[in-house]
């Protein structure tokens, strides 16, 4: 095993741990909607929500880094350059996360001054981490970029996947710098803040997960490099076009020009199509050439990634980004429904797939299967779909009673929040969240359990 792959296992361990923390604070946040005075003046709703969202971003980022460190030496045929720096920044990353979590748990608030912005909370959603921590994350990403680029140079080898990954590193680092400006004009602040949220999380991450899925498909299913690289190029083209212009659906109601209404409404739904096409084409190719996967859990999570990314980010996103609908749906649980479905389909399923790839290759079994992974797979997916539908029900109740009928007043918001349809949706979110948490427990158990050794004959694929 390469030294970088051992580092990858550390990243996976940290990511799965933070996945559990995210679920814990997600359940707590769900309880606040049902019992608003819960932990009043001890640990309020907004801090629970911050920890839920921020740990989501960080555990996925750690999963991405782990996946690249796992596949980079396999793709280029040599150890990753600058491993001592990579290992150092891993521990720095973990320390930053631990300190920020402690500040959010025990300090929580600060005054409206520079000290609070630097050491307590920047006050911007998704990037609430104090400024020193954001600088630490930039340092981690710069070292990661150095590791990838220096390894490619030393190996004197570049594949199509590596070209896409290297080019994606530029916006991956640069766009995160939008976390730093502190602008007093709310419209200007939101204008650039959405570059961070949309372009960093929804665009550069889409390309990054595309690179990871391309490597996983070749590894798990023996898919032709020509197929995955072709779809990866299509994804880059769509991100450059639809991804950037799709940013417009965030610009409907923040004081930007009216032309964003038509631009944002159309282009938002195109982003998930290449990843869906890549996986569907890979499955078709595997059937044509009679290829068989040796890793059932990874295979099922890959196909789930493609399907739920298309539904969650594509269909769920498109049905609420049309400006005629978004006028009523924005800022409701309808948006939260889309957010849960999109993140889960676009990223979570893919990271779980690479976890099972690592499990198989570290345990040395020819065929990875079993029963526990099926329970984890079923509970996680059933729990997520249930949460999404519950949130959609609650969001539609808010859009109808609070916006369309009530006229978006404070009284209308309160009335909608007490509506039986809204309350039922939030109870469904809570109960299915518990199912999702049970799936997480089974997933962790299965990842930590040694698989049975079952030898299988290696199928010889027909030439592509």
Residue ranges and their predicted role:
Residues 27-34, 40, 47-152, 179-186, ...:
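Membrane-interface helix-loop-helix modules in multi-pass inner-membrane proteins
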Residues 14, 52, 95, 145, ...:
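Divalent metal-coordination and catalytic microenvironments
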Residues 8-18, 81-94, 160-171, 221-242, ...:
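Interfacial and helix-entry/exit segments of alpha-helical transmembrane bundles
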Residues 54-68, 132-147, 200-216, 269-283, ...:
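Hydrophobic cores of alpha-helical transmembrane segments in multi-pass inner/ER membrane proteins
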Residues 1-9, 398-422, 450-464:
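Extramembrane terminal tails and long inter-domain/linker segments of multi-pass membrane proteins
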Residues 43-57, 194-202, 257-268, 329-347:
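Transmembrane alpha-helix entry/boundary detector in multi-pass membrane proteins
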Residues 1-46:
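N-terminal regions that are enriched for targeting/export leaders
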Residues 193, 197, 209-327, 335:
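Membrane-embedded translocation segments of transport machinery
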